[in-house]
């Protein structure tokens, strides 16, 4: 799905915060380890406020996509990589994103989650 590739490209180019705020639906949800669900664009913006994301990069590669027969919902899953610039620490894992077509025809995610600890080489 082009939206997911564009999402990752924006994260790499302009930072994770900008990418997530650009691609989350207004009522989208993010599930992360050891955290309550982040519900909606406004809550995500409040979490990101005053927290720079220039110290690390997050990118991902979708390996599968499916759009439902109605053309308004779809999902992607794949592998992600993170890199902490100061320490050189890397991470990788898997993710799934559920997408909804918006009234303007664009795709925004309504649910995003991932798990860590899976080396990219074990695809």
Please place each PLM-identified region on the residue numbering.
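Alpha-helical solenoid scaffolds in eukaryotic macromolecular assemblies
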Residues: 6, 66-68, 117-118
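Short, structured motif recognition centered on aromatic/hydrophobic residues
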Residues: 7, 73-77, 96-99, 107
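A short acidic/glycine-rich loop-to-helix N-cap element
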Residues: 86-90, 119-123
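Short beta-strand edge/turn micro-motifs at domain boundaries
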Residues: 92-118
């Amino acid at each position: 799905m082009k939206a997911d590739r564009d999402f990752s490209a924006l994260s790499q180019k302009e930072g994770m915060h900008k990418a997530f705020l650009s691609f989350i639906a207004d009522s989208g949800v993010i599930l992360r380890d050891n955290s309550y669900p982040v519900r909606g664009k406004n809550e995500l913006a409040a979490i990101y406020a005053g927290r720079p994301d220039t110290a690390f990069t997050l990118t991902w590669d979708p390996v599968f996509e499916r759009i439902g027969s109605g053309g308004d919902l779809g999902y992607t899953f794949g592998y992600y990589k993170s890199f902490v610039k100061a320490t050189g620490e890397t991470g990788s894992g898997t993710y799934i994103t559920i997408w909804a077509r918006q009234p303007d025809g664009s795709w925004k995610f309504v649910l995003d989650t991932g798990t860590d600890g899976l080396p990219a080489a074990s695809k």
